[in-house]
Amino acid sequence: MTVVIGLTGGIASGKSTVSQMFRELSIPVIDADIIAREVVEKGKPAYNKIVEVFGTEVLQEDGELDRPKLGSVVFYNEEKRLQLNKIVHPAVREEMNRQKEMYIKEGMQAVVLDIPLLFESKLTSLVDRVLVVAVKPHTQLERLMKRNNFSEEEATARIQSQMPLEEKVKNADEVINNDGTIMGTKTQLQAILKKWNIID
């Protein structure tokens, strides 16, 4: 039986580090962010719907989607954000499911669905186990400011636009505390995978 793991965390909690560790263990990772980019490529059904709803002003000169522009349109407009999610989420879910089924057919021991908004998008039904990568609030703030060159205000706004990390931790099957070293994180991950009988 393939164990389907949902990997999530808060913004800048170090989820991609853990995602990379899974890959190093030869466990396939299906990345929701990459799929979300692919499903809105020029000419795809979701792309056509976005242009229909938001108009050509969210396009670059070459006709591809101008993601930052679309992002700023929906960031401050709840109604438009919901409209966009209604187009993109089903397309992403469908593609993730397709890839997941492919790995299950291949008889993989485990497959990871790397979904930043696993809880917010109500996608927990796609996975068997939820693994949350967590950090302390001040670590999260510092990392986000450094990584995205955000002011404290901008970083706080981004963090607050997501479900609180402690809420995710409460709903997780297992939690990796990513405040320490890379080695410490790896040790925690290996212990969890042993517990789930995925690695020896």
UniProtKB/Swiss-Prot annotation:
Gene3D superfamilies with a match to the protein in the record: P-loop containing nucleotide triphosphate hydrolases (3.40.50.300)
Enzyme Commission number(s) from the entry: 2.7.1.24
Pathway(s) this gene product operates in, as recorded in its UniProt entry: Cofactor biosynthesis; coenzyme A biosynthesis; CoA from (R)-pantothenate: step 5/5
PROSITE patterns with a match to the protein in the record: DPCK
Cell compartments where the protein resides: Cytoplasm
Cellular component aspect of the GO annotation: cytoplasm
Enzyme kind, highest EC tier: transferase
Gene Ontology terms describing biological process: coenzyme A biosynthetic process
Residue positions binding ATP: 12-17
UniProt xrefs under InterPro entries: Depp_CoAkinase, P-loop_NTPase
Keyword ATP-binding in annotation: yes
Catalytic activity: 3'-dephospho-CoA + ATP = ADP + CoA + H(+)
Record bears the keyword Nucleotide-binding: yes
Entry keywords, A to Z: ATP-binding, Coenzyme A biosynthesis, Cytoplasm, Kinase, Nucleotide-binding, Transferase
GO molecular function ontology, one term from the record: ATP binding
DPCK domain boundaries: 4-200
Functional description taken from the UniProt entry: Catalyzes the phosphorylation of the 3'-hydroxyl group of dephosphocoenzyme A to form coenzyme A.
Family: Belongs to the CoaE family.
Name of the featured protein: Dephospho-CoA kinase
Name of the encoding gene: coaE
